Structure formats: structure tokens, C-alpha cells
Swiss-Prot record:
GO cellular component: cytoplasm
Additional free-text comment from the UniProt record: May have arisen from retrotransposition of the X-linked UBL4A gene during mammalian evolution.
PROSITE patterns: UBIQUITIN_1 (PS00299), UBIQUITIN_2 (PS50053)
Superkingdom, natural source: Eukaryota
Coiled coil: none
Basic and acidic residues composition bias: residue spans: 151-161, 168-181
Domain annotation Ubiquitin-like: ranges: 1-76
Keywords of this entry: Cytoplasm
Native species: Monodelphis domestica (Gray short-tailed opossum)
Gene (UniProt): UBL4B
Subcellular location: Cytoplasm
Protein name as catalogued: Ubiquitin-like protein 4B
Family matches, as SUPFAM superfamilies: Ubiquitin-like (SSF54236)
Region (Disordered): 139-181
């Protein structure tokens, strides 16, 4: 079966694999095609992180499915190196600004509401939202994308709606035929 594997900034490749392939083997193929080290890869299918020891069929991944690759940052090798002090967090800075315009109690209430709205907005974000943000923040050609030869695809390939997956995942995930089709 053919799978599309897509990096956050839009690079993608088509890989031919078996549905019984283990996730760690797929990571090896992705590493060769997109030049992303296996240890830095986090593969996602429909928002679910794939475990290395599971098979693709355990996640009901079928032909023409699209997987996303999130690249983990490199781990620091020297723990003795003190980390650079970060700039002050957004919330204390925002609190200082609010205190200039509101009473302390009102500023606290406004800040609490802003934090709650911010948290809710982040929870609603999906990978497409992150990709759009990354394209704005990292102009085309400036990211460290893959340079190897890959077979480019045109647009996302939607999974087949009629595919029925009877493999019950340990978390109870079960793909059924869409209602109304």
C-alpha cells in the first residue's frame, strides 16, 4: 500500500509499505527519504502518536492514508551547560500592562480570562493550523526541510470513507463506515 508522509512545512513523500509493517521500520524509510533522524521523528495519524512497536494495521492505517511527521528537537548532550535565561514570560508582562489600566482585582480577572481563552484556542488547534502558522513564521526556502529525492504528491489524500477496520485498538478505537454513505 502507498502512504503519504508529510512534514509540518509541507515536504512530503510517498512510501510503499505493508499494512503489517512496524512503525519503527516506517521511521527508517522516512529517515532515508526525508533525511530526518529516526530518533527525532514523531509519527502521527489523525492526531494520534504512533508507537514504534505497533504495526500500521493496529492504527487502521490503510492505503492512501496520510501520516504527519513532527520533528523533535535535538536533545542537549551536556547537562552541565546552564541554559540561557529566557525572556520574561508573556503572562507577567501582560499583567504589568493590565495593572497600568485596571485595578489589581480587575487586572487579575482580565488576565485569568485571557489565559482561559488562550488555553481553549490552543486546544482547538490542529496540525493544519500549525502548518499555516509555521509557513508564516518560516518563509518558504528558509526551513531546514529535506533535500533528497522524494515523490511529491498533489494535496492531501483523504482516507477511504468506506474502509471498515475491525481491529479494536486497546483504547477502544474502531473505524466504522461513515454514517450516510
Amino acid at each position: 500500500m502507498w502512504l503519504t508522509v508529510k512534514l509540518l512545512l509541507g515536504r512530503r513523500c510517498l512510501l510503499q509499505v505493508s499494512e503489517n509493517e512496524k512503525v519503527f521500520m516506517l521511521k527508517r524509510l522516512v529517515s532515508k527519504q526525508l533525511h530526518v533522524p529516526e530518533k527525532q521523528q514523531r509519527l502521527l495519524f489523525r492526531g494520534q502518536v504512533l508507537a514504534d512497536n505497533k504495526r500500521l494495521s493496529d492504527y487502521c492505517i490503510g492505503p492512501n492514508s496520510t501520516l504527519n511527521v513532527i520533528i523533535r528537537p535535538l536533545e542537549k548532550t551536556s547537562p552541565e551547560t546552564p541554559s540561557q535565561p529566557r525572556s520574561q514570560s508573556l503572562w507577567p508582562q501582560l499583567n504589568q500592562i493590565l495593572l497600568k489600566h485596571f485595578s489589581p482585582q480587575d487586572a487579575e480577572n482580565v488576565l485569568r480570562r485571557l489565559r482561559e481563552d488562550h488555553r481553549k484556542s490552543l486546544q482547538r488547534m490542529n496540525l493544519d493550523d500549525l502548518e499555516r502558522i509555521s509557513k508564516v513564521l518560516v518563509p518558504e526556502g528558509k526551513h531546514s526541510g529535506a533535500t533528497g529525492s522524494t515523490r511529491e504528491s498533489k494535496g492531501d489524500m483523504e482516507p477511504r470513507r468506506n474502509m471498515k477496520c475491525n481491529l479494536a485498538h486497546k483504547d477502544g478505537f474502531k473505524r466504522e463506515k461513515s454514517p450516510g454513505k
